[in-house]
Amino acid sequence: ERISLYRELDSLSNEDDLLAYKKRLIDRFGALPEEAEQLLNVVRLRWLCCKMGIEKVMLKQERLTLVFTRTNDKYWQSEVFGRIVEFVYSRPQRCRIAEDKDKQGKPTGRRYATIQQVKTISGALTLLNKILTGKGE
């Protein structure tokens, strides 16, 4: 049963569906624990990252890592990427953008950003929404 719930959650594609899913969970199991709420926010974070051209997102030890899509040059010239760069470079003590290197130290072409002092999934979601809308922090 748990696996089918996770699969259904993974298949959702918009906020309305997510809210309907949450309502069904509450109807079935009662009030959701904080961990379940955070899981719903993980889905929201994944959607937001897709919209921003972020292929992978990790939050570990209060550090948010955003791995950008390997894509054509259009993305690197986009308004969204420009907002990310502006945010990162205006906070050099907290953020940086770098390029991955292979075992021999050669660039792989994969770029990523790290942002320190992000404590929760909710915090990451709020921060990325602010970057996306150009409202900073």
Protein language model regions, located:
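Accessory helical-bundle/CTD segments and flexible terminal tails appended to RecA-like ATPase motors
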Residues: E1-E137
